[in-house]
From Swiss-Prot:
Gene assigned in the entry: rpo11
Entry protein name: DNA-directed RNA polymerase subunit Rpo11
Alphabetical keyword list: Cytoplasm, DNA-directed RNA polymerase, Nucleotidyltransferase, Transcription, Transferase
Source organism of this protein record: Nanoarchaeum equitans (strain Kin4-M)
Gene3D superfamilies for this protein: RNA polymerase, RBP11-like subunit (3.30.1360.10)
Family to which this protein belongs: Belongs to the archaeal Rpo11/eukaryotic RPB11/RPC19 RNA polymerase subunit family.
Gene Ontology terms describing biological process: DNA-templated transcription
Length: 96
């Protein structure tokens, strides 16, 4: 089962930029999300920041070239990540 963070908070948003905080998440989610975000046409930058492992001041940023809204790019990236994780889960359990 895939769980979602307990709290997702949009810290900043324009058409071309979105900065989102995912409470309780770490490099595990952010690295995968960053790699997938770069596969979406129109994404110029995808990055994350974790201030300190013991603090919950972390966030993810997507910046686009204007051909796609940053919010839409983030949603697409999250959907692609979910799909890849479900495919991996199916592959894993079928090969045990």
């Amino acid at each position: 089962m895939i769980t979602i963070p307990t709290e997702v908070k949009i810290l900043e948003e324009t058409d071309n930029l979105i900065k989102v905080q995912f409470k309780g998440e770490t490099h595990t989610l952010f690295n995968a999300l960053k790699e997938i975000a770069y596969t979406i046409n129109g994404v110029k930058k995808a990055a994350y920041f974790i201030e300190h492992p013991l603090k919950d001041n972390n966030y993810f940023i997507i910046e686009t070239d204007g051909s796609i809204k940053a919010r839409d790019a983030l949603i697409q990236a999250l959907k692609k990540l979910k799909e890849e994780l479900l495919n991996f889960k199916d592959w894993y359990y079928s090969n045990l």
